Every structure is written in C-alpha cells, then in structure tokens.
C-alpha cells in the first residue's frame, strides 16, 4: 500500500473489490446473443443498483467485437451486436463505502479458440505483471515495459491506449493524474 488517505480501510477496500467482481460476473451470466453495447450498459446499471453502489469512478464500459480494440476515450462504432462467436469485455468502477472496486474482465460468447487464447493471454499477462510488480517493486514505466514483454511472449501486442491506475480509497485521482 502506498499513498492511501486517512480513511482507507483494507477490509472495506477488499469488500469493494469483491462486490465489483460479483457484479461483473453476474452481468456476464446474463449477457445474451443479439445484445448491443447499450443493452449491456443498461444491464450493468440494473445490477449495480441491486448491489447499492455509491457512485462510479468512471463510466461503465461494455464493449463488443471490434469495439474491444478501442481505447476507453474512443467512441464505439454503432450497430454492433453480440454474435454467437464473439468477444466482449465489461469494465466498471463503482465505489462501496467510499472505496473503489474498479474491475474489468474479457469474456467470450461461444467456443472460438482464438478468443479463448486472447482471454487466457490477457489473464496471464495481468497476473505475471502483478507478481513482478509485487516482487520487484516496479515503477510505472517498468511495469508497462514488463507487461509489453509478457504480451509479446504470448504472441500479442499490449494496447498502451488502455492504461490502468492505482486502486484504493476514493478519489485516487489525486495520485493518478
């Protein structure tokens, strides 16, 4: 932990993370072929309401197919519907008890092996990079360099338009921007 506020509470932070993961998994379990990104966003909002979130650190992101390659700031192409063999991601940033639970995950519809490989590589790169950060105390630049190399080892190119940020008590922007 570094540079958290005086109100930071580890159990509250961990609970926020777990609730956020639950929301993402519940939304994914209700995703259906034919949905649009707007439908996915509505489903996320309905699910967040059920979990009594406080506010959002960032807008929901529910991206499908080719739109998954866009940065968060880029506008999605219209007219994209989830197909039988498709890839999509969910990224949400709710706060619970003033602690951020930002979490995202990539999913697939169907059994497309290429999509499965992408998802597995994403998770492997994430966990290997997190491990290296913990064990080696990487700086931000070193962390992204390491992640780039891990992506390349897995046959992919890291999309540097999609940078992450620290998590903790809200707002973390004081430390991020």
Predicted regions and their residues:
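Active-site neighborhoods and metal-handling regions in enzymes and metal-associated proteins
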Residues: 1-177
């Amino acid at each position: 932990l570094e540079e958290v506020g005086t109100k930071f509470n580890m159990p509250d932070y961990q609970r926020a993370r777990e609730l956020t993961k639950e929301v993402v998994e519940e939304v994914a379990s209700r995703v259906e072929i034919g949905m649009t990104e707007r439908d996915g966003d509505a489903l996320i909002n309905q699910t967040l309401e059920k979990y009594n979130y406080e506010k959002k650190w960032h807008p929901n992101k529910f991206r499908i197919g080719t739109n998954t390659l866009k940065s968060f700031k880029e506008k999605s192409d219209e007219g994209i519907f989830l197909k039988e063999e498709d890839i999509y991601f969910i990224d949400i940033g709710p706060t619970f008890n003033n602690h951020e639970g930002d979490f995202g995950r990539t999913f697939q519809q169907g059994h497309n092996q290429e999509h499965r490989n992408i998802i597995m590589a994403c998770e492997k790169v994430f966990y290997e990079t997190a491990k290296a950060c913990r064990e080696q105390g990487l700086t931000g630049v070193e962390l992204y360099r390491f992640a780039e190399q891990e992506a390349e080892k897995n046959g992919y190119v890291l999309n540097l338009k999609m940078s992450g940020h620290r998590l903790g008590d809200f707002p973390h922007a004081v430390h991020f921007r």
